[in-house]
């Protein structure tokens, strides 16, 4: 076996980044679920005010960690530290994650958090058993859309998700004409 000519040393960082990627995903999905970006679009806030407005009952340190995680991922900006920190949306978050804006693209991410995240957690079982790992699991019915139309709430969430994921295509189409 020959080794490719390269001066680069093997590096596990990409493996670790992808393997632990659910940390970043869940931070973003929870922030969307809490409508944090909508809250911060109207006013910059400190961690204490955010904790109160969102009804969080965890420790202040956990709130700092949650918010600072979002800062490190580029979804929030921060001025100051700890109790003196003021948090605001990053430009992208302000445009695409504020539910009150027509540019809101979080619908697909809401569905990812509410439905898909759990199902992907059962990928191993699905591969081993061949059984569906979504709402049709155990029902013997593989017709996802039939089940979807039975629940107005799930249908609305699905439609919002599809709208969010297609928004960029619609904008491109309009720009062409």
Identify the meaning behind each predicted range.
Residues 2-6, 11-49, 53, 60-177:
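Conserved Class I S-adenosyl-L-methionine-dependent methyltransferase catalytic core
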């Amino acid at each position: 076996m020959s080794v490719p000519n390269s001066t680069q040393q093997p590096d596990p960082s990409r493996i670790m980044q992808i393997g632990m990627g659910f940390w970043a995903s869940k931070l973003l999905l929870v922030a969307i679920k809490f409508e944090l970006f909508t809250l911060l679009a109207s006013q910059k806030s400190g961690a204490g005010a955010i904790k109160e407005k969102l009804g969080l009952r965890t420790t202040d340190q956990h709130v700092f960690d949650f918010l600072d995680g979002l800062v490190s991922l580029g979804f929030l900006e921060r001025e100051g530290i700890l109790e003196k920190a003021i948090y605001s949306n990053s430009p992208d978050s302000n445009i695409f994650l504020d539910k009150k804006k027509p540019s809101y693209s979080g619908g697909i991410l809401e569905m990812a958090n509410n439905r898909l995240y759990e199902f992907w957690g059962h990928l191993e079982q699905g591969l081993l058993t061949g059984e569906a790992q979504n709402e049709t699991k155990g029902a013997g019915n593989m017709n996802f859309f039939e089940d979807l139309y039975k629940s107005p709430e799930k249908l609305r969430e699905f439609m919002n998700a599809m709208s969010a994921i297609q928004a960029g295509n619609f904008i491109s189409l309009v720009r062409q004409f």
